[in-house]
């Protein structure tokens, strides 16, 4: 039995990262001692996790100490402008995100807890562990939850202009886990980091499956630019006078672009065909209202929403992103469309809407694919990694 610590920015938010960490922690704790460290504000955030945790898992809230007005200003300027990869800017960014007092507290916390292995969830916590790796006794790895572009795209990547910072910190770690082979190759070629691929598990098992007779396309995720929902409005508008004329579109989720999408719906006259739910907790119930899942994302690491769709037997229409390769084969579990070709996306939606038999066959294939992604099977791959690191 190993003592494992997991560092995550948020455990009590509603998102894919929180969901999959909860799922795997529930598996790890069957054989190990697991503590999850989360940065939620103790006074403002509740204690309820949307995704059930085993009572054996210890959850510890921690503060981001050592902060100051100047550090907050530097972070604000970075998020608004991106700053640059210059030496001075990198020095300022490290001090702004990882002040010395903060790093010292983490060194003491990990060493005092006698952890065998620490797992940093996503880039910000991977860098934290990298900066203190030389001063802790535990092995340390990162578990990255986005595509390479999602992190390092110069315009929209979360860690834009911090690639060198990430690289210097991450190369000190004992391991790195990514979600697909495309990310693995880019980490190797552009960062010089050898990464292990472990897929995310499906987030639930369901006896109830989607009804292929329903005439509804469904999608799920944050209503933000990278999800490409404007393409769905184009596609449903293109197809509304053909085989999709009786079909509706349900967007499960909310976000900063909800207002803009609603305005576009009105301009296109789609108010009766498209609805946006806002943030909901009963995602499974909402997904069952559809018979085809559509995903027009610009990038994905390993879309949990697709694993959920597969589990419910929903055929999938998606762009040809590398993240889709392990999940959906064109003509098997769904239709894969050349990236960002809105007209072909609309044609794929029309094709599935027009064939009950195609939807039924793809639904059966989707269920078989979901069975390969059970948490128990994914946990076996993690155990292999733990054994290699700790032997």
Kindly give the residue locations of the regions a language model identified.
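An aromatic- and histidine-rich active-site surface loop
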Residues: 94-107, 117-137
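Membrane-proximal helix-turn-helix segments that form the acceptor-binding/catalytic region
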Residues: 104-112, 158-176
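Donor nucleotide-sugar binding/catalytic pocket of nucleotide-sugar-dependent glycosyltransferases
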Residues: 139, 148, 165-206
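Nucleotide-activated donor-binding/catalytic signature segment of Leloir-type glycosyltransferases, i.e.
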Residues: 262-278
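Aromatic "clamp/platform" in nucleotide-sugar-dependent glycosyltransferases that forms part
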Residues: 279, 298
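Conserved acidic donor-binding segment of nucleotide-sugar-dependent glycosyltransferases
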Residues: 330-331, 335-342, 351-356, 371
């Amino acid at each position: 039995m190993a003592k494992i610590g997991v560092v995550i920015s948020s455990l009590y938010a509603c998102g894919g990262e929180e969901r999959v960490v909860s799922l795997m922690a529930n598996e790890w704790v069957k054989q190990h001692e697991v503590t999850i460290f989360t940065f939620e504000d103790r006074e403002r955030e509740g204690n309820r996790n949307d995704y059930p945790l085993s009572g054996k898992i210890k959850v510890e809230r921690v503060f981001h100490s050592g902060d100051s007005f100047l550090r907050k200003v530097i972070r604000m300027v970075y998020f608004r402008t991106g700053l640059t990869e210059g030496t001075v800017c990198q020095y300022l960014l490290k001090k702004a995100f990882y002040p010395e007092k903060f790093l010292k507290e983490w060194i003491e916390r990990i060493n005092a807890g006698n952890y065998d292995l620490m797992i940093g969830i996503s880039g910000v916590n991977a860098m934290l562990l990298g900066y203190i790796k030389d001063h802790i006794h535990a092995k340390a790895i990162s578990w990255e939850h986005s595509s390479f572009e999602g992190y390092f795209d110069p315009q929209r990547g979360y860690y834009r202009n911090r690639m060198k910072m990430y690289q210097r910190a991450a190369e000190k770690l004992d391991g790195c886990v990514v979600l697909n082979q495309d990310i693995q190759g880019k980490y190797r070629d552009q960062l010089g980091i050898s990464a292990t691929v472990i897929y995310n598990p499906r987030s639930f098992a369901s006896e109830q499956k989607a009804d292929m007779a329903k005439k509804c396309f469904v999608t799920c995720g944050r209503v933000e630019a990278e999800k490409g929902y404007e393409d769905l409005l184009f596609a449903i508008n293109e197809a509304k006078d053909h085989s999709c004329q009786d079909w509706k579109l349900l967007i499960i989720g909310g976000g900063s672009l909800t207002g803009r999408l609603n305005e576009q719906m009105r301009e296109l006259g789609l108010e009766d065909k498209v609805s946006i739910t806002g943030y909901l907790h009963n995602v499974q119930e909402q997904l069952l209202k559809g018979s085809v899942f559509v995903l027009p994302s610009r990038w994905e690491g390993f879309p949990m929403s697709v694993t959920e769709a597969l589990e419910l037997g929903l055929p999938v229409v998606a762009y040809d992103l590398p993240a889709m390769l392990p999940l959906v084969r064109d003509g098997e579990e769904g239709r894969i469309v050349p990236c960002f070709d809105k007209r072909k996306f609309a044609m794929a939606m029309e094709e599935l809407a027009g064939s009950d038999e195609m939807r039924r066959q793809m639904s059966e294939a989707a269920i078989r694919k979901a069975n390969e992604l059970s948490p128990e099977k994914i946990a076996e791959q993690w155990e292999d990694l733990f054994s290699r690191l700790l032997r």
